[in-house]
Amino acid sequence: MTDVTVKSLADEIQTPVDRLVQQFADAGIKKSEVDSVTQQEKETLLAHLNREHGSAPNKLTLQRKTRSTLNIPSTGGKSKSVQIEVRKKRTYVNTPEAEQAKAEEQAQREAEEQAQREAEAAAQKIAEEKAKRAAEEQAKREAAEKAKRQAAEKEKVTNQQTDEKTKPAQTDKARREAEAAELKRSVEEETRRKVEEDAKRVAEEARKMAAENEGKWPEPVAEQTESADYHVTTSQHARAAEDENDAKVEGDRRSRTRGGKATKQKKGNKLSESKADREEARAVGRKGKRKPSTLQQSFNKPVVAVNRDVVIGETVTVAELANKMAVKGSQVIKAMMKLGAMATINQVIDQETAQLVAEEMGHKVILRRENELEEALMSDRDTGAEAAAEHRAPVVTIMGHVDHGKTSLLDYIRSTKVASGEAGGITQHIGAYHVETENGMITFLDTPGHAAFTSMRARGAQATDIVVLVVAADDGVMPQTIEAIQHAKAANVPVVVAVNKIDKPAADPNRVKTELIQHGIISEDFGGDVPFIEVSAKVGTGIDDLLQAILLQAEVMELKAVRTGMASGVVIESFLDKGRGPVATVLVQQGTLNKGDIVLCGFEYGRVRAMRDELGRDITSAGPSIPVEILGLSSVPAAGDEVTVVRDEKKAREVALYRQGKFREVKLARQQKSKLENMFANMTEGEVSELNIVIKSDVQGSCEAICDSLEKLSTDEVKVRIVGSGVGGITETDATLAAASGAIILGFNVRADASARRVVETEGLDLRYYSVIYSLIDEVKQAMSGMLAPEYKQQIIGLAEVRDVFKSPKFGAIAGCMVTEGVIKRNNPIRVLRDNVVIYEGELESLRRFKDDVNEVRNGMECGIGVKNYNDVRTGDVIEVFEIIEIKRTIA
């Protein structure tokens, strides 16, 4: 037979090559994948595998099927035949432990049989020697008797001999008798000595065998047989048991058939025993002398709690936490309910909750960080730490109340007219610009002043070095001014106050200074450290002083940054451009951002395909404190995300996907839990009306601001639910979502495409466009007001005094009244007052004047009034007529 390689042999026997090479190595043959294998080496490997795994089958399955007919008596004295088929299947497993126990039992049995045979042989030998000695004694006795007879005969013949001859004969006889007794005594002693020696030898051998096999055999053989697994039986026992059981079933069937009735089983009948009892009795022994013992479970439940080290990630399900602690999921749910939180077995819980539950159940918690890949990616960055830090331009954020002139002030500095381009003349985006002055460069961030843009102002304060607080001299401190002060204090950045509109006649700078003192902004004139600059964005008054104050403050702060190395920064704003895709406005804080760099930005990543400055010009690099627009990200990032340049695009993608999954898990884990204390609040949720809205905006910041503002409009009766929101134009998907959820579509500075308009027309959806956030919020308020349940108010329209009471066969008591105030109308509800206390409330049944039915009676006229289902009208009562007015409610 030709030799084959290891790889071809592995393909032939369908096993991995590595496993086959390892098996050759275990057999003592060193082979590689391309080496050839001879027939002898194959046989050597096969012999090794047989020794390793064994070639005998370890499992034997017996299947039997018996059919029988059972006659069952029924009503009417007839019997009904029922066909019975009994199918039996038993599997006997020959495990290595069973084989070892069987071999040990066989060895012990053979040793006992050998000892018994040796004892029997010794006893037989002793018996043979004893019989031989008895035969010898018998022969001696017979010889003595024969000699005695011969002597007697000789005595008779020689009776006449002399006494001299007789005396020696008697002496010989006595001597022979003494010799015979001595021989008998010696034979008995020899026999007894040999028997004692044989007994000692057998006992000594038994002791040696017991000492050698101590630890190998169980103590008593009978107990080993009892405690052995009754499944480990020989095939002969199995067949015998099957035959015996079949014979019992067949005999029972025949007895039923002969008697026509099922005979009652006796109390001691073996058929009443369970199958396990019968097999246990068969495993104990076939002789039946020993009573079957009850099987005892060898495993005892531990009574001491086991404390484990539980490793918990940032999120974990209840089932996973239970598996880590080796307990049932129901126990974890009970522990969470004791802590005041309800959860299902598949619910995701956060790390803090899981830690509390595990520690409550007595386990040690090990918190695991899952962002090793992200840390490794961030550590493999060339940050230029060895380079010297250089001075950089300050980042200045313009903040203040709406319409106080922030953008106009910045426009005058930049000598542009951006404010006219903003819808409604208010800023709705963060604008980032850098300006070259005579004393250096300054980067400005213009934030919205409207109340809806709180989060955008907070982001601007966090990314800035200096805050310029713009306050109108004729308007003073307003709510958004106070909020801007709070953002500046939270970000711990210095403030420069610009008192704008100083050219107006109603300007009062001292009033502004006084009002700001209440909020911790103290002017230098009043002994504080905050510079106040009076400016006019319209005529340019004080602009140079403002820039000088900003640069002076920056010089005091000693702002520095490293220009070399990989860049890092923050996203100021982001939006989706129809032609360019996702666009992000990034403020570079460290390093230099170059075209072609791989960036990781929050949940998104990508390569910088293009860079543009605030004027729309293409640039190739941007240093610290320079705002740029970058293209090439995978999607629109969230405003405020950190931008980092990394080396590997593949790892950047993995980190971005990991962040997305982590954010989703954390969001699910931290959703509103069904806690015990708000169960009743959840029961009343069905009574609340919902206004579903789909919002699409041009930039991420505006979308976020609109969503926050609309959610704040929710009341106890009407709830605003944002079904979907995003950046970019209104697409067919958005229209389909609105149709499915019954929502209205609001577009802020965006429009719907043709397919979306087609869906809107087909489904009859409400689509509205806005360019100013004021209008959007006001119209949503109106829509919510229409969903509010109206209020009802009772208004008194007339009073009538009862002057006399008449009886009518048709209406009962009729009150003759004088209208003292207002108008009495026929179809309105009434109240009957007695001593200014309401005693009845109902409606008019009849209103007449001079026997004529009328619809109303005015002040100063008499009339007859019949009250429906009420006859206890008395003189002096007052009848009050009122009407119910519906009042529409509005949301403030």
UniProtKB/Swiss-Prot annotation:
GTP binds at residues 400-407, 446-450, 500-503. Its main location: cytoplasm. The keyword Membrane does not apply. Residues 500-503 are annotated as: G4. Residues 99-217, 239-254, 270-283 have a biased composition (Basic and acidic residues). Keywords: Cytoplasm, GTP-binding, Initiation factor, Nucleotide-binding, Protein biosynthesis. Residues 51-296 are annotated as: Disordered. GO terms for molecular function: GTP binding; GTPase activity; guanosine tetraphosphate binding; translation initiation factor activity. GO terms for cellular component: cytosol. Residues 400-407 are annotated as: G1. Residues 536-538 are annotated as: G5. Residues 391-560 form the tr-type G domain. Residues 255-269 have a biased composition (Basic residues). The keyword GTP-binding applies. It is found in: Cytoplasm. Residues 446-449 are annotated as: G3. Residues 68-82, 224-237 have a biased composition (Polar residues). Residues 425-429 are annotated as: G2. Belongs to the TRAFAC class translation factor GTPase superfamily. Classic translation factor GTPase family. IF-2 subfamily. One of the essential components for the initiation of protein synthesis. Protects formylmethionyl-tRNA from spontaneous hydrolysis and promotes its binding to the 30S ribosomal subunits. Also involved in the hydrolysis of GTP during the formation of the 70S ribosomal complex. This is Translation initiation factor IF-2. The gene is infB.
